[in-house]
Amino acid sequence: MKKFFKTLLVALLLIPSCAWANGWNNAEYQRIEQSIQLPGIKQSAKKYAISAYGAKQNVSAAQNQKAINKLIALVSKKGGGTVVIPKDTWRTGAIEMKSFVDLHLEEGAVLQFAFEPKLYPLVRTSWEGIACWNYSPCIYAYKVTDIAITGKGTIDGGGNNDTWWPMNGNTRFG
């Protein structure tokens, strides 16, 4: 019984120190929050719907990927604007963001990334802090500024048991 109370006392003394060590002080929180800036995308910038620039419901993910990436590059080259993903499901491959572009998903829009490795080119990225070349993530940005992903739509990366599980390749997970 004596041992139990000693252990309990030690635990009670350690709990506040653990909470203090992991806690954020308010000044640090405010410093970080104040360093965050909104992207420099003009609020009055023109909007470009992907459906008006070649993306369609009844085409391959590769065709939509090409149309979306071409539109993003065009909008960036024009000085910026909003690329709109309209309400519906749009299958695509990797999307590469460019400077001064807001990728906006309307309510009810689904940007669905296809499970086709050829649609994800090798790009410079990092894995657990190590720089490397790897398959592109669904949405990729490198050496760009002032980008945003906004709206009430859904980004579906396709992470389900049929696509992700076989790539994991580790039997200990199931």
Question: Where does each model-flagged region fall?
Answer:
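Extracellular "leader-to-stem" segments immediately downstream of a signal peptide or signal-anchor
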Residues: 2-84, 89-102, 106-174
